């Protein structure tokens, strides 16, 4: 069940999560691919070529689905070169970002289910072609989407330097 942050109980105390516990916890979160298509650029965190997400090529207007249930915390024109973006807040301080959209289909505060259409593929912002730029962040830190997405052999060729 989804809860707004104002509905969550503040009475429960949670002990700090260690790095090992965090990795084990994140492995249990099952995201779905937000769009079908080939990955044209992977996740990179080295000093010279930073890319905080993956780029998935798809035709303009293709439906983008919520990778997990969550609440829309942003839907509009994003900062920098992101163009139209949707940002979803999920359980356990996990956030997913969907960028370069042609059209956003959700509104701030809306609760969405996993697999629900939230936007369509486009090339808004600084994009060189129609694709979805997809990011996953845990407590504001970018993590490789591949850690949470099901394995797809067609995407093995894309670099992932996370």
Report each predicted region and the residues it spans.
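Short, small-residue-biased leader/transition segments that mark boundaries at the very start
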Residues: 1-2
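Surface-exposed, glycine-biased beta-strand/turn segments
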Residues: 6-83
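Acidic, glycine-rich catalytic/binding loops that coordinate metals and/or anionic ligands
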Residues: 31, 57, 110, 135-162
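A residue-level detector for short acidic-glycine micro-motifs
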Residues: 41, 58, 74, 100-103, ...
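Active-site loop architecture of trypsin-fold serine endopeptidases
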Residues: 49, 80, 121-133
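Short hydrophobic beta/alpha edge segments that flank linear recognition/processing sites
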Residues: 56, 84-88, 113-125
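Short, well-structured beta-strand-loop connectors
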Residues: 63-73, 105-121
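Zn2+-dependent peptidoglycan hydrolase active-site motif and core
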Residues: 67-105, 130, 135
């Amino acid at each position: 069940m989804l809860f707004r942050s104002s509905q969550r109980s503040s009475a429960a105390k949670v002990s700090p999560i260690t790095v090992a516990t965090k990795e084990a916890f994140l492995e249990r979160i099952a995201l779905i691919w937000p769009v079908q298509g080939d990955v044209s650029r992977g996740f990179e965190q080295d000093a010279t070529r930073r890319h905080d997400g993956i780029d998935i090529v798809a035709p303009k207007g293709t439906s983008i689905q919520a990778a997990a249930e969550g609440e829309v915390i942003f839907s509009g024109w994003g900062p920098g070169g992101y163009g139209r973006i949707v940002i979803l807040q999920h359980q356990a301080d996990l956030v997913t970002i969907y960028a370069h959209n042609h059209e956003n289909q959700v509104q701030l505060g809306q609760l969405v289910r996993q697999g629900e259409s939230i936007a369509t593929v486009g090339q808004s912002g600084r994009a060189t072609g129609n694709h979805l730029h997809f990011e996953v962040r845990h407590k504001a830190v970018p993590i490789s989407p591949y850690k949470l997405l099901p394995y797809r052999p067609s995407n093995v060729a894309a670099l992932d330097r996370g």
